[in-house]
Amino acid sequence: MQHLPAPIHHARDAVQLPVAIDYPAALALRQMSMVHDELPKYLLAPEVSALLHYVPDLRRKMLLATLWNTGARINEALALTRGDFSLTPPYPFVQLATLKQRTEKAARTAGRMPAGQQTHRLVPLSDSWYVSQLQTMVATLKIPMERRNKRTGRTEKARIWEVTDRTVRTWIGEAVAAAAADGVTFSVPVTPHTFRHSYAMHMLYAGIPLKVLQSLMGHKSISSTEVYTKVFALDVAARHRVQFSMPESDAVTMLKNRHA
């Protein structure tokens, strides 16, 4: 059984990557970063696309694609409704409420803290395939804007994915197993949060400024975002190909001439 990067490496001249990177070099740099347990574990774009290939169910595939295209935390993605998406050209986007802010809203509902303005972040949806597939899913599965809560009897905004975090982990596990059965394996463990890390690294490879990425990720502190640059710095340094050596005899001649 071979790892996914091997066949892609051999076919790299014929494959168009979504972001222009030296894929074999990026793989090598990721393997280097995995030595440090504190650094994020992420997949590269070809690996994510390959994983999605093994998710035939449209609803499941689009949840994982949403994590990949938005960098959302799993609870943020599971809270999404149709109204959170604006798919109108030329700038489709999704509105996400961050983990901390959603927790505060729940606390206010329980009467434990005063109400305040709930902050959301807007994440552009720049991938046309993703937007098209999302529209197809909504139309095909007839996902409603609202539905009646059977427990309370109230009409509420309908969540697109009425599942739990554990269910999503099961979906991912099934996809990884299906890939392995087909001879495709992944170098890092895949969890819902892996897609968030993968989004961040993909955006850095695409040249997105760090402060912009901080906003897209919903990080309160820039230090949370800077962890990705610790990995990305390896790529930057490698691409510059900084040399340290020169012919020793030439160096000696230079120094002698300096004193001539």
From Swiss-Prot:
Keyword Metal-binding: no
GO BP term, pick one: DNA integration
Catalytic residues as annotated in Swiss-Prot or TrEMBL: R73, K105, H193, R196, H219, Y228
Any GO molecular function: DNA binding
InterPro entries, A to Z: DNA_brk_join_enz, Integrase-like_cat_sf, Integrase_catalytic, Resolvase_Rsv, Tyrosine_recombinase_XerCD
Alphabetic keyword roster: DNA integration, DNA recombination, Plasmid, Repressor, Transcription, Transcription regulation
Family: Belongs to the 'phage' integrase family.
Its job: This resolvase acts at the RfsF equivalent resolution sequence of pColBM-CL139.
Name used for this protein in its record: Resolvase
Organismal lineage: Bacteria, Pseudomonadati, Pseudomonadota, Gammaproteobacteria, Enterobacterales
